[in-house]
Amino acid sequence: DYYASRGLGDVYKRQVYDSYDEMFTDPDVDIIYITTPHNTHYGFMKKAILNKKHILVEKSITLNSDELGELIALADENNVVIGEAMTVYHMPIYKKLNEILKSGTLGRVNLITMNFGSFKEYDMKNRFFNRSLAGGAMLDIGVYALSVIRWFFDSKPDNMLSQLKTAPTGVDEQASLLLSDKEGQMATVMLSLHSKQPKRAMISCENGYIEIMEYPRAWEAKITYTD
């Protein structure tokens, strides 16, 4: 509600806009944080870029690689920066674990096992299950697991197998994935919007393994050396 927002804006001395377009075209705005549902990211990002605004956008940044590729090219043309608010790439714990792995004490990473599950009451209007809002397990929670895998893999995965269980709306309610890269590293992912699972990552190496609990917002990890 614009008038309710206006009242808060007056209290906290913040600018309030009557429309998205008004915000995108405001010359005093340098950067925009986009937190709307996934299906709106592409359109809002494109408008922001064309108005020379830098962007931080919630995951998932876009619905597919074609959308993202177009926006990256457009951002380069307009000399603006776009970034995805993915926790994994910016947390100190992951940088520290990367340092430990690079030291060689654990040996090579061979297998990564990821779990992420929660129970959501089925509601076709809820964004988790609404296809028009780009719902589903992969775009909502799977991106965390894939980001961890990409962080620890030596190269980009070039092979993927998947199996899905779909909700009545057609979105992926549960999913299992098997990924591998050209170096022979493998990863398995189990996702669910209809089953409780720990948010657990296991990084299995030649000389031991790393366990990360609550990996989307991890603050600690357990390292076990088997030699």
Predicted regions located by residue number:
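Rossmann-fold dehydrogenase core element
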Residues: G69-T87, R108-L111
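Beta-loop-alpha module in the N-terminal Rossmann-like domain of NAD(P)-dependent dehydrogenases
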Residues: R14-I72
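Contiguous beta-strand/loop segments that form the cofactor/metal-binding neighborhood of enzyme cores
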Residues: S147-W219
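Structured catalytic cores of enzymes that bind and process phosphorylated ligands/cofactors
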Residues: I31-T40, F44, R127-F128, A137-I149, ...
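Single conserved hydrophobic/aromatic residue that forms the stacking wall/gate
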Residues: D1-Y12
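Hydrophobic residues in well-ordered beta-strands that form the structural core
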Residues: D18, V57-E58, I82-E84, I212
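Predominantly a Rossmann-like dinucleotide-binding segment in NAD(P)-dependent oxidoreductases
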Residues: V88-M160, P168
